[in-house]
C-alpha cells in the first residue's frame, strides 16, 4: 500500500464562530498504480483532503501513513514526502513565472541540486509525458494556449518524479477541446507510465472519462 488515511479530521478556525468541520473521519487506502476519482461539489472538502496528502495541511486528528511511515512522526522527512506526492493545484498555469518553458519545468529538479544532465533529462521526459514537443522548451510559457500552459504546469510536477500525482480540478476554465486533451493526457500518463493518480473534480463527466 502506498498511502493509508485513517480517521482523518480537519477543522478550520477551531474554537471560534467561523469553525467549520471540513473533513470528518476520512478513511482511504491508496495502492500503487491506482487511478482514483475524487468527486464532490464546490466546498465539500476535496482540496482540503488533497493538501493533507503531501503535508501542506496537518490534520486536527487522525493519521496518514506513506509507505508504512507516519507522516506526523517528529522525525519524518516532510520535504521528501512533498517530492514523492506531487500536487497540481487548480489553475496551475497561474504559478508559471519563468521566461521559458524549460526554466519553468526544470525549476523543481534544479532546486533538488541535481546534476545539469539529470535536470535536462527530467525536463525533456516530463514535456514528452504531457504530449508536448521539446521545440517549445525555448518558448515563453505566456505565449502558449490555456491547455498548453496547463500541460507545462503538470510537466513541472512530473519532472520531480512523484510516486503519487494529485490533480485538483485539472480541466477548470478550459474549453471543451482543451478539457478533452488534458483528460486524455492524464489517462495516458496512467496507462503508459503507471503513475498513481488522484483526479479531483466536481464533474462526474470528467471522472467518467
Pin down the residues of each PLM region.
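Conserved ABC transporter NBD signature motif
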Residues: 62-73, 81
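Catalytic Walker B motif of ABC-type/P-loop ATPase nucleotide-binding domains
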Residues: 165-168
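Conserved catalytic motifs of ABC-family nucleotide-binding domains
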Residues: 161
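Conserved ABC ATPase signature
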Residues: 140-144, 148
